[in-house]
């Protein structure tokens, strides 16, 4: 899938190409795992084409490696779509409110991700109940909007109702998964590939130099 495009904004050397190819292989393995998880939780999942709530309000943390791969996707977009993305970045930047600023992803065009195959880890894992290394659970915000897990989500307690799970006859219990990038980076196949993730920033921070 990797297509190297020369541009004024980024130059890719042999080592970077190797890293990006390894990252692409990593994504194939990761997707296999995530797809199985979504399949296990399919009774509670409402994700479908045209559903873009997760792309409409977020901060989108990206490692440097993830961003470089995303940038390849951007470089291969038709010129008219590139212009729309750049306009989105400029518009979001004008609205920027500092740390913890929630915004629409600039790559969301007409309700669809314009760089879907190149999207980051946060985009691939959203929609599931997650658990960090300290055991803290996070239920996807779309549960409050009548989507994933909403059938068994108690808005008053902000928790999953085991009573509703049983009462409604679900076959499996909702499960939480540690899908943080920090955890994913430690998976055996990730370590074996020797990926250099680089620093982590919010997506908007990575993108701003390209409109200056």
At which residue positions do the language-model features occur?
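Short loop/turn segments that flank or connect secondary-structure elements
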Residues: 1-53, 57-58, 62-212
């Amino acid at each position: 899938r990797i297509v190297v495009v020369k541009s004024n904004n980024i130059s890719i050397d042999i080592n970077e190409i190797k890293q990006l190819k390894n990252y692409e292989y990593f994504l194939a393995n990761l997707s296999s795992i995530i797809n199985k998880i979504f399949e296990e939780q399919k009774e509670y999942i409402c994700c479908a084409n045209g559903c873009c709530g997760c792309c409409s309000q977020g901060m989108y943390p990206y490692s440097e490696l993830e961003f470089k791969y995303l940038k390849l996707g951007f470089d291969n977009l038709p010129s008219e779509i590139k212009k729309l993305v750049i306009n989105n970045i400029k518009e979001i930047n004008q609205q920027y409110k500092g740390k913890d600023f929630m915004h629409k992803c600039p790559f969301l065009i007409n309700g669809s991700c314009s760089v879907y195959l190149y999207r980051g880890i946060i985009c691939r894992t959203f929609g599931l109940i997650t658990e960090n290394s300290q055991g803290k659970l996070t239920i996807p915000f779309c549960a409050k909007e009548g989507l994933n897990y909403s059938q068994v989500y108690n808005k008053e307690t902000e928790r999953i109702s085991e009573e509703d799970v049983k009462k409604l006859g679900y076959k499996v219990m909702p499960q939480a998964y540690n899908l943080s990038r920090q955890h994913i980076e430690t998976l055996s196949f990730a370590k074996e590939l020797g990926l250099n993730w680089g620093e982590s920033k919010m997506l908007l921070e990575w993108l701003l130099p390209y409109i200056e």
